[in-house]
Amino acid sequence: MNFSINRIVLLDNLSKAAKVIDYKNVNPSLSGIYLNVLNDQVNVITTSGILSFKSILNNQNSDLEVKQEGKVLLKPKYVLEMLRRLDDEFVVFSMVEDNELIIKTNNSDFSIGVLNSEDYPLIGFREKGIEFNLNPKEVKKTIYQVFVSMNENNKKLILTGLNLKLNNNQAIFSTTDSFRISQKILEIQSDNNEDIDITIPFKTALELPKLLDNAENLKIIIVEGYITFIIDNVIFQSNLIDGKFPNVQIAFPTKFETIITVKQKSILKVLSRFDLVADDGLPAIVNIKVNEDKIEFKSFISEVGKYEEDFDDFVIEGNKSLSISFNTRFLIDAIKTLSEDRIELKLINSTKPIVINNVYDEHLKQVILPTFLSN
C-alpha cells in the first residue's frame, strides 16, 4: 500500500471518522480507522455497530495519488496527533509488511504500529431506499433547535431519540423528554408518496450536525431499520430505534387565552438572573405572574434566597391575569433556539403547557409543561 494525499483533507476526514468510534466496544478492531486503498480512491471507514461512517477520497477532492493498492487499520490517536503537528501540504502513507505504517513528508517520516485489517468486519452501506434531499444548513440548524428536548438517559429508549416524519412534502423533526417538546417543520420536494415515521438515536443526532459543516449537498435514504445520510463525499449510516414515538402533536394547543409578545433578548436577560441552581442540585423554578401591564417574576431557591423582578417590555393579548411556574433552564433553552427578535409566549391557564415560537414563523415550536409548587 502506498499513496500520497493532501494532509489537511486527510486529517479532516480521519477526525470525522474517529468521532463515530465507540472505544468501549469489546471488539478491539472496531477501535480503528479502516483505510481501503483502491486504484483511484481511498475509502475511510469506521463503525460503532450502531453508527457507520465512510468517506471517499480521490484526486479531485484530496489530490490523491495511489501508487499501490492495499488496506490498513489505523490506531487513530497517534496518527491524528502527528497529522495535526505536521506543516507539510502532502503526506505519503505506505506499509512495511503487514504491521507497520510509514508516514512520510518532504522532511520527516515516522512509523507506527497498526491493527490487523483482516479482523475488520465488512460494513454494508445502504444507498437505496426512500430518498429525499434537504438543505444541509437547514438540517444542522434544525437539529440544534430540537436537541434541547432530548435526554440521552431517559428510561424510555424511544424518548432518547429524534423523531422524523415525512408527509405532505414536509419533514417534521420532533423530540421530547416528557416535560417539554421541540418540533421543527421543513418543507421538502420529494417524489415519495409514502408516509415515514422513524426515530434516530441520540448519538446520531449529536454527530450529524458536525458532518454538515460546509456541506453543499445532503441526500437522506431510509430503508427498513436504517437511515443513511449522503453528505458530499461522506456516507453516514445509523440504525433506527425500534418502537412507536408518541404522538406529540396532540400536546400542541390550537387556542390560547393569553399571548405575550416580547423581545427575545430582553426576556432572556431577565430569566438568566433566575437561573441559579441550589446546593441540593434541584433546578431553579420561576413563577411568572401576569398582572395587566406588568409581569412579576419570582423565585425562591433553598440556601440561596428569594429573588423578584418586574418586567413591562411586552405586549399582551387576551387574559391579563395569570400565574404559572416553569423550570427556568427549560425556558431559557427553548427561547435561545428562536431566531427572530420578537417571540410569542402562548398560554391557556396555570395547568396547561406554554407554547413558544417566533412571531412570524411557526415552523419551530417549543412546548414546556408547567411546574406545580407546593405552598
Curated annotation (Swiss-Prot):
Bilayer-crossing regions: none
A GO term, aspect molecular function: DNA-directed DNA polymerase activity
Keyword ATP-binding belongs to the record: no
UniProt-annotated location(s): Cytoplasm
Pfam families xrefs: DNA_pol3_beta, DNA_pol3_beta_2, DNA_pol3_beta_3
Biological processes per GO annotation: DNA strand elongation involved in DNA replication
GO CC annotations, alphabetized: cytoplasm; DNA polymerase III complex
Principal cellular location given in the protein's record: cytoplasm
Entry keyword Translocase: no
Record key words, sorted: Cytoplasm, DNA replication, DNA-binding, DNA-directed DNA polymerase, Nucleotidyltransferase, Transferase
Similarity section: Belongs to the beta sliding clamp family.
Stated role: Confers DNA tethering and processivity to DNA polymerases and other proteins. Acts as a clamp, forming a ring around DNA (a reaction catalyzed by the clamp-loading complex) which diffuses in an ATP-independent manner freely and bidirectionally along dsDNA. Initially characterized for its ability to contact the catalytic subunit of DNA polymerase III (Pol III), a complex, multichain enzyme responsible for most of the replicative synthesis in bacteria; Pol III exhibits 3'-5' exonuclease proofreading activity.
Quaternary structure annotation from Swiss-Prot or TrEMBL: Forms a ring-shaped head-to-tail homodimer around DNA which binds and tethers DNA polymerases and other proteins to the DNA. The DNA replisome complex has a single clamp-loading complex (3 tau and 1 each of delta, delta', psi and chi subunits) which binds 3 Pol III cores (1 core on the leading strand and 2 on the lagging strand) each with a beta sliding clamp dimer. Additional proteins in the replisome are other copies of gamma, psi and chi, Ssb, DNA helicase and RNA primase.
Protein name: Beta sliding clamp
Organism the protein comes from: Mycoplasma capricolum subsp. capricolum (strain California kid / ATCC 27343 / NCTC 10154)
